[in-house]
Amino acid sequence: PSPRLLVLDEATAGLDPIVRDEVLEIFNEFTREEDHSILISSHILSDLEKLCDYIAFLHQGRLLFCDEKDRLLEEYGIFVGTADQVNSLQDGAVVARENSSFGGVRCLVKRALVPAGWALERPTVEDIVLFLVKGAKEQ
């Protein structure tokens, strides 16, 4: 009998990008069977984005989020604009912000709280994590 659950800790750490991609494809093949799952911990967030349906993120012993990957990516957006634009958003819309190199502001926002028509970039899981950690440090 083959295993139905793999528990992996930093399974792709230290691998070169080509081998890492091949290992991720093996994992994807494993999970294509409905009764197969993988529980994986990793600092390589792009691997999690390629592999996982659900992502939980722990930071300094605190659970910052645990949700479906697709729901996370739909909930948040990246806005790049002026400080005045960002300051005009309703309370709670801006999750975290940083000054950008061109003198504007780059921030993680909750899509549902941003006016229609505002151009938002689709974040990566890494974008979301970095902004949430930075936001946690500022509070």
Kindly label every feature range from the protein language model.
Residues P1-R4:
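A short, proline-enriched helix->beta-strand linker immediately N-terminal to the Walker B motif
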Residues L6-E10, L15:
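Catalytic Walker B motif of ABC-type/P-loop ATPase nucleotide-binding domains
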Residues P17-V19:
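Helix N-cap at the start of a conserved alpha-helix in ABC-type nucleotide-binding domains
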Residues I26-I40:
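Conserved catalytic loops of ABC-family nucleotide-binding domains
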Residues L48-K50:
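A short, surface-exposed alpha-helical micro-motif characterized by mixed small hydrophobic
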Residues C66-D67:
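ABC ATPase "signature
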Residues V94-Q139:
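C-terminal coupling/interaction segments
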